Protein backbone atom coordinates (compact mmCIF):
# COMPACT_ATOMS: atom_id res chain seq x y z
CA UNK A 1 0.00 0.00 0.00
CA UNK A 2 2.82 2.37 0.95
CA UNK A 3 4.66 1.63 -2.31
CA UNK A 4 1.48 2.39 -4.28
CA UNK A 5 1.17 5.83 -2.61
CA UNK A 6 4.80 6.65 -3.40
CA UNK A 7 4.26 5.60 -7.03
CA UNK A 8 1.20 7.85 -7.35
CA UNK A 9 3.06 10.84 -5.86
CA UNK A 10 6.01 10.38 -8.25
CA UNK A 11 3.65 10.04 -11.23
CA UNK A 12 1.82 13.24 -10.23
CA UNK A 13 5.09 15.19 -9.90
CA UNK A 14 6.24 14.04 -13.35
CA UNK A 15 2.89 15.16 -14.83
CA UNK A 16 3.15 18.63 -13.23
CA UNK A 17 6.72 19.12 -14.46
CA UNK A 18 5.71 18.03 -17.97
CA UNK A 19 2.79 20.50 -18.08
CA UNK A 20 5.04 23.30 -16.82
CA UNK A 21 7.61 22.54 -19.51
CA UNK A 22 4.99 22.60 -22.27
CA UNK A 23 3.65 25.92 -21.04
CA UNK A 24 7.08 27.55 -21.16
CA UNK A 25 7.66 26.17 -24.64
CA UNK A 26 4.41 27.67 -25.94
CA UNK A 27 5.29 31.07 -24.49
CA UNK A 28 8.69 30.97 -26.20
CA UNK A 29 7.10 30.13 -29.56
CA UNK A 30 4.62 32.98 -29.15
CA UNK A 31 7.45 35.44 -28.46
CA UNK A 32 9.35 34.26 -31.53
CA UNK A 33 6.28 34.68 -33.75
CA UNK A 34 5.81 38.23 -32.53
CA UNK A 35 9.44 39.06 -33.18
CA UNK A 36 10.22 39.89 -29.54
CA UNK A 37 13.91 39.33 -30.23
CA UNK A 38 13.84 41.33 -33.45
CA UNK A 39 17.20 42.91 -34.25
CA UNK A 40 17.11 45.72 -36.83
CA UNK A 41 20.79 45.33 -37.62
CA UNK A 42 20.54 41.67 -38.64
CA UNK A 43 17.14 41.92 -40.34
CA UNK A 44 17.66 44.99 -42.51
CA UNK A 45 15.49 45.01 -45.62
CA UNK A 46 17.27 45.33 -48.98
CA UNK A 47 15.23 48.14 -50.54
CA UNK A 48 16.82 47.72 -53.97
CA UNK A 49 14.82 44.50 -54.44
CA UNK A 50 11.57 46.43 -54.96
CA UNK A 51 10.96 46.99 -58.67
CA UNK A 52 9.61 50.52 -58.74
CA UNK A 53 10.90 53.97 -59.68
CA UNK A 54 9.14 55.50 -56.66
CA UNK A 55 10.83 56.04 -53.28
CA UNK A 56 10.64 53.02 -50.97
CA UNK A 57 10.75 53.27 -47.17
CA UNK A 58 11.60 50.60 -44.59
CA UNK A 59 10.25 51.24 -41.10
CA UNK A 60 11.54 49.02 -38.28
CA UNK A 61 9.11 48.64 -35.38
CA UNK A 62 10.48 47.41 -32.06
CA UNK A 63 9.30 43.93 -31.01
CA UNK A 64 7.53 43.34 -34.32
CA UNK A 65 9.63 43.79 -37.46
CA UNK A 66 9.69 45.80 -40.65
CA UNK A 67 7.10 47.50 -42.82
CA UNK A 68 7.96 48.59 -46.38
CA UNK A 69 6.10 51.55 -47.90
CA UNK A 70 6.12 52.82 -51.48
CA UNK A 71 5.62 56.60 -51.77
CA UNK A 72 3.66 58.23 -54.60
CA UNK A 73 5.24 61.61 -55.47
CA UNK A 74 3.07 61.96 -58.58
CA UNK A 75 -0.04 61.97 -56.36
CA UNK A 76 1.09 64.15 -53.43
CA UNK A 77 4.48 65.69 -54.30
CA UNK A 78 4.99 68.04 -51.35
CA UNK A 79 3.65 65.50 -48.87
CA UNK A 80 6.19 62.98 -50.18
CA UNK A 81 8.99 65.58 -50.10
CA UNK A 82 8.09 66.26 -46.47
CA UNK A 83 8.15 62.57 -45.56
CA UNK A 84 11.50 62.13 -47.31
CA UNK A 85 12.96 65.14 -45.51
CA UNK A 86 11.83 63.87 -42.10
CA UNK A 87 13.32 60.43 -42.77
CA UNK A 88 16.65 61.83 -43.99
CA UNK A 89 17.01 63.99 -40.86
CA UNK A 90 16.27 61.01 -38.58
CA UNK A 91 13.04 62.53 -37.30
CA UNK A 92 11.20 59.20 -37.27
CA UNK A 93 14.04 57.23 -35.64
CA UNK A 94 12.93 56.34 -32.09
CA UNK A 95 9.61 58.04 -32.78
CA UNK A 96 6.44 56.07 -32.02
CA UNK A 97 3.04 54.78 -33.03
CA UNK A 98 0.61 56.03 -30.40
CA UNK A 99 -2.86 55.26 -31.78
CA UNK A 100 -4.55 52.05 -32.92
CA UNK A 101 -8.16 51.54 -33.95
CA UNK A 102 -8.50 47.95 -35.24
CA UNK A 103 -9.97 47.79 -38.72
CA UNK A 104 -9.41 51.53 -39.16
CA UNK A 105 -5.96 53.08 -38.58
CA UNK A 106 -2.53 52.75 -36.98
CA UNK A 107 -1.18 56.26 -36.36
CA UNK A 108 2.28 57.55 -35.48
CA UNK A 109 4.97 60.11 -36.20
CA UNK A 110 4.37 62.35 -33.18
CA UNK A 111 7.61 63.04 -31.25
CA UNK A 112 5.60 63.59 -28.04
CA UNK A 113 3.71 60.31 -28.40
CA UNK A 114 0.45 61.99 -27.45
CA UNK A 115 -1.13 62.85 -30.79
CA UNK A 116 -0.56 66.59 -30.36
CA UNK A 117 3.04 67.02 -31.53
CA UNK A 118 4.79 67.66 -34.81
CA UNK A 119 8.00 68.89 -36.46
CA UNK A 120 7.46 72.58 -35.67
CA UNK A 121 5.85 73.44 -39.00
CA UNK A 122 2.93 72.30 -41.17
CA UNK A 123 2.38 71.70 -44.88
CA UNK A 124 -0.42 72.36 -47.33
CA UNK A 125 -2.99 69.56 -47.39
CA UNK A 126 -2.84 67.82 -50.77
CA UNK A 127 -6.43 66.57 -51.08
CA UNK A 128 -9.66 67.51 -52.87
CA UNK A 129 -11.28 69.44 -50.03
CA UNK A 130 -8.24 71.73 -50.13
CA UNK A 131 -8.43 72.33 -53.90
CA UNK A 132 -5.79 69.73 -54.74
CA UNK A 133 -6.47 66.71 -56.94
CA UNK A 134 -5.64 63.50 -55.11
CA UNK A 135 -7.56 60.41 -56.22
CA UNK A 136 -5.82 57.87 -54.00
CA UNK A 137 -8.50 56.04 -52.01
CA UNK A 138 -8.20 55.34 -48.29
CA UNK A 139 -8.13 51.56 -48.57
CA UNK A 140 -6.29 48.90 -46.59
CA UNK A 141 -2.53 49.50 -46.66
CA UNK A 142 -2.66 53.15 -47.75
CA UNK A 143 -0.57 55.67 -45.78
CA UNK A 144 -1.96 59.18 -45.30
CA UNK A 145 -1.17 62.34 -43.35
CA UNK A 146 -2.96 63.12 -40.10
CA UNK A 147 -4.11 66.68 -39.41
CA UNK A 148 -6.32 68.59 -37.00
CA UNK A 149 -9.89 69.63 -37.79
CA UNK A 150 -8.92 73.28 -37.28
CA UNK A 151 -7.46 73.66 -40.77
CA UNK A 152 -6.73 71.72 -43.95
CA UNK A 153 -3.10 72.81 -43.70
CA UNK A 154 -2.18 71.37 -40.29
CA UNK A 155 -0.36 68.17 -41.28
CA UNK A 156 3.26 67.97 -40.16
CA UNK A 157 4.82 64.63 -39.27
CA UNK A 158 1.94 62.47 -38.08
CA UNK A 159 0.73 59.80 -40.48
CA UNK A 160 -1.62 56.83 -40.38
CA UNK A 161 -1.71 53.44 -42.06
CA UNK A 162 -5.14 52.25 -43.14
CA UNK A 163 -6.22 48.92 -41.62
CA UNK A 164 -9.39 48.84 -43.70
CA UNK A 165 -11.38 50.96 -46.15
CA UNK A 166 -12.74 54.33 -45.00
CA UNK A 167 -14.40 56.20 -47.88
CA UNK A 168 -15.25 59.18 -45.67
CA UNK A 169 -11.52 60.04 -45.53
CA UNK A 170 -11.23 60.29 -49.32
CA UNK A 171 -10.68 63.88 -50.40
CA UNK A 172 -10.24 64.97 -46.77
CA UNK A 173 -6.71 63.72 -46.03
CA UNK A 174 -3.51 63.55 -48.07
CA UNK A 175 -2.95 59.90 -49.01
CA UNK A 176 0.58 59.52 -50.38
CA UNK A 177 1.75 55.90 -50.36
CA UNK A 178 1.03 52.26 -49.65
CA UNK A 179 2.44 49.36 -47.64
CA UNK A 180 3.93 46.91 -50.15
CA UNK A 181 5.65 44.47 -47.78
CA UNK A 182 5.54 43.50 -44.11
CA UNK A 183 1.77 43.45 -43.70
CA UNK A 184 2.15 40.58 -41.22
CA UNK A 185 3.92 43.07 -38.95
CA UNK A 186 0.87 45.35 -39.05
CA UNK A 187 -1.49 42.43 -38.44
CA UNK A 188 0.48 41.31 -35.38
CA UNK A 189 0.35 44.84 -33.95
CA UNK A 190 -3.39 45.02 -34.57
CA UNK A 191 -3.98 41.65 -32.88
CA UNK A 192 -1.69 41.97 -29.88
CA UNK A 193 -1.41 45.58 -28.71
CA UNK A 194 -3.51 46.84 -25.78
CA UNK A 195 -5.61 49.97 -26.29
CA UNK A 196 -5.81 52.21 -23.22
CA UNK A 197 -8.61 54.47 -24.47
CA UNK A 198 -11.23 52.85 -26.70
CA UNK A 199 -12.61 56.25 -27.76
CA UNK A 200 -9.35 57.71 -29.05
CA UNK A 201 -7.38 54.54 -29.76
CA UNK A 202 -4.49 55.65 -27.53
CA UNK A 203 -2.21 52.67 -26.96
CA UNK A 204 -1.35 51.54 -23.43
CA UNK A 205 2.30 51.41 -24.48
CA UNK A 206 3.49 53.32 -27.53
CA UNK A 207 5.33 51.32 -30.20
CA UNK A 208 8.85 52.50 -30.96
CA UNK A 209 9.95 53.06 -34.55
CA UNK A 210 13.58 52.07 -34.07
CA UNK A 211 14.81 53.14 -37.47
CA UNK A 212 13.54 54.37 -40.83
CA UNK A 213 15.48 54.02 -44.10
CA UNK A 214 14.68 55.21 -47.62
CA UNK A 215 15.77 54.38 -51.17
CA UNK A 216 15.09 57.26 -53.57
CA UNK A 217 15.79 55.01 -56.58
CA UNK A 218 18.38 57.45 -57.90
CA UNK A 219 16.03 60.42 -58.11
CA UNK A 220 16.10 63.84 -56.49
CA UNK A 221 13.07 65.52 -54.95
CA UNK A 222 12.21 69.14 -54.25
CA UNK A 223 12.69 70.66 -50.84
CA UNK A 224 9.54 70.53 -48.74
CA UNK A 225 7.39 73.68 -48.83
CA UNK A 226 6.65 74.51 -45.20
CA UNK A 227 4.11 76.66 -43.43
CA UNK A 228 5.98 77.93 -40.38
CA UNK A 229 4.07 77.78 -37.11
Question: Model-flagged regions — what are they?
Answer:
Residues 10-15:
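Hydrophobic helical h-region of N-terminal Sec-dependent signal peptides
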Residues 2-3, 7, 18-229:
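Cyclophilin-like peptidyl-prolyl cis-trans isomerases
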Amino acid sequence: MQNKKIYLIITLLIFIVSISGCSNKKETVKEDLLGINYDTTSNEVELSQYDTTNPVVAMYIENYGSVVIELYPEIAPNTVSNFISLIKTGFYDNNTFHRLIPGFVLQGGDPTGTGTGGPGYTIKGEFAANDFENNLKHEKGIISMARTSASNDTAGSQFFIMLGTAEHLDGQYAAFGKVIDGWTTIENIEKNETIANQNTGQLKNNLTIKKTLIDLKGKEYNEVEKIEE
